[in-house]
Each structure stands twice: as structure tokens, then as C-alpha cells.
Amino acid sequence: MFGYVRPSLAKLSEEDTARFGAAYCGLCRVLGERYGLAARMILNYDFTFLSILLWPQEEPEELQKNCIAHPFRKRDYYPGNPALELAADESVILAWWQIQDALSDPGKGKAKYHAAALGLKGAYREARERRSAFDAVTREQLERLRRLEEDKCPSLDEPADAFAKLLAAAAGEAGDPVKRRVLEQLLYHLGRWIYLVDAADDLEDDFTSGSYNPLIYRYGLQSGELTGEAREGLVVSLDHSIRLMAAAFELWDFGVWKNIIQATVYEGLFLVGRAVLEGTFQSNDMAFRITGRNKEQL
């Protein structure tokens, strides 16, 4: 999974920070309730953000409870609802197919992926039954990605489009048709942004292992570092996707979630993208972590 989609902490009030934390903990609980303890390991900020996009506009009910990760202090969380359930189901499906893709990649170690597949097999079967349409799109687009990788596709747009269409499919169950169209556009460009940021983040490892990375073939890179031309071109592409996300965001009233989404689209993505390009995101990950109401990092 990725974990790149995070709001800017500087732009969030204490109330909104706590609200995001309660959604994150709520998603963790729903994953555990629907799919067991192993499924909680795939929890990330990206699908928390998806649940927020799908959430109704009004303030949700907030509860407090201890959990296995924090047994000595109660954590605020939102109980299960359709938005959290959808995010949980689709995160299981995407995680499963990403694991299968990793197992088919000759450039990666297999032991941890075999273990992950074993832990998620039952969960995936249940999630597939619940979200068959999303599962079908995920399989189709990841297979398309696999073919592009085999062909050493030199385009950034083609593989990014495959992942973008995959994520846009998550909007399919939004009830309101106008909101569905808004989310399709927002999630499409978010998916495109995630794919390209992940390619930049993996560049050094992919170059060393000989794994496919579209940046290597698009810019003819001779090392695991971006040239000035490649960096400039990638920044333009990433910024373009963010601007289109912002345009979609402005077309819908997201109610109590507006500030969190705004802090993500208008600043959080820029900050994460910059950190990835500077090579500081992985080493400084804690600086991007969200804190709950009790000031504990999520």
C-alpha cells in the first residue's frame, strides 16, 4: 500500500485533526471487525481519505474505546458506517492484488508476500463478494499495468491512467449522481498522482533491481536519480493532477470534512510530493503522521 495521501498538519485545527484521527481509528476497527486482525495491517491514510470523501456531510457520532494497539488509553473513533465499510472492503481488494503483483515480480523477495497473501486470502474472498465490480476493475487495470511493465512502456500517462481508473472505480457506489461524478474525477487524478509519486519514491530501488519504473524509460535515466529534465517534467505532471483534483473538489459541499479534504488537496499532496522528490519522505515519515485527540501519532 502507499500512504502518501495526508492533510497538511499546519492547515488543520485541533478539531479537524481529531476528526481525521477518529476516522483512521474507525477504519482500523472496521477492517478488524469484517476481516480479522491481519487485515488491520493494511490500514493506511489513503483509504482513510477515501472514506472521508464518501462520508455524509454531517458530523458523525464519536465513541471511545481501548484497542489492541493502544490497550492503556482509550482512543476516539467513529463506529462502522457505509463509508468506512466501503473503504475497508476496497482496501482489502487492492492490497490483495498488489500482493499478487509483487509475487509475480522476479525482482522482489517473495517470503513476506507469501505470508501476506496467506493472511489476506480469506478476507479477499469476502471483500470480492461484497464489491465484485471494484474487484473486476482492479484486476483489469492491474493486468493492464502488468502488460505495460512487460513491454517497458516509456510513457508516464499510460500506466498512470491504469491506476487512476482503478481508483476512480471506488466512486461507483456514491449514492448521489453529482457527487459520484465529482468523486470519479477527484479519485482519477488522485490515483494518477499516487502512481507517479510512488514511481519517484521507488526509483532508486527499481533501478538497482532492474524492476520496471516508467520514469527510467520515459527519461532514459542512467542511474536511480532523476535528472533536472526528468524532475521538472514530473513536477509539472504532478501539479497538473493536483489542480484537477482541486477543481473537482470545488464542485461539491463536503460538509464537516471540507477542511480536511482542502488541507490534503491544496497543501498536503504538494508537501508529500516535494519530500519524495527530495528523498526525505521515507526517512522523515514521522513528520507527516497525524495525531489523534490524545496527541498520539496514528
Where do the language-model regions lie?
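Acidic catalytic motifs of isoprenoid enzymes
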Residues: 1-185, 192, 196-231, 235-239, ...
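N-terminal phosphate/diphosphate-binding loop that engages ATP/GTP or pyrophosphate donors
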Residues: 285
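Long, low-complexity, intrinsically disordered segments
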Residues: 288-298
